[in-house]
A protein has these predicted regions:
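Catalytic cores of nuclease domains that cleave nucleic-acid phosphodiester backbones
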Residues: 1-45, 70-76
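Metal-dependent nuclease catalytic regions and adjoining charged, substrate-binding loops involved
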Residues: 8, 49-54, 64-155
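Residue-level detector of short, conserved catalytic/binding motifs and their immediate flanks
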Residues: 23, 60, 142
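Amphipathic alpha-helical segments in well-structured domains
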Residues: 55-59
Length: 155
């Protein structure tokens, strides 16, 4: 749990907003450094399947929490990848650092919280500005339930 200061002009209540996230595992090594561990499954383990998490909001959030919980004794984030296809294997390594992204991530959270406050109380989901993304609008399991509504509007 982290309390993040609100942006100037944010209409939400209080001086901070709550940001929560759940880690798979949090450990301390023999030198006393704290690590946040996340488990991921994959059909292949390559350097690109590791690097894709470097700028992921989930992992940037882990770094925010790790720094808050452990301070200078934060070791980082460990990704424990388990290969599902034969031959089965696993790979455990620390995530590449992204210090600028971690700094910017807090600002992104503030911006999102400000946007949520701005549009709170609207009647329907279509009263919000849409977010257009091939990752959101049409995922690997098919289109979002509002895909056609975003395409054509409410006719």
């Amino acid at each position: 749990v982290a309390h993040i200061p609100r942006m100037e002009g944010d209409t939400g209540e209080g001086d901070t907003f709550l940001y929560t996230q759940r880690a798979d595992l949090i450990v301390r090594d023999v030198q006393g450094f704290g690590w946040i561990v996340d488990h991921k499954t994959a059909y292949r383990i390559t350097s690109s399947t590791l690097r894709q998490y470097c700028l992921s909001g989930q992992f940037l959030g882990y770094q925010v929490f790790g720094r808050k919980m452990f301070g200078a004794k934060f070791g980082g984030v460990i990704l424990n990848r388990v290969k599902l296809a034969a031959p089965h294997q696993f790979d455990r390594c620390s995530l590449e650092p992204a210090p600028q992204a971690v700094t910017d991530f807090v600002g992104t959270l503030k911006e999102i919280e400000s946007r949520i406050s701005k549009y709170a109380g609207r009647e329907t989901g279509m009263d919000f500005p849409p977010v257009f993304s091939d990752q959101t609008c049409y995922g690997k399991y098919g289109p979002c339930p509002a895909f056609e509504l975003c395409r054509w509007g409410d006719e």
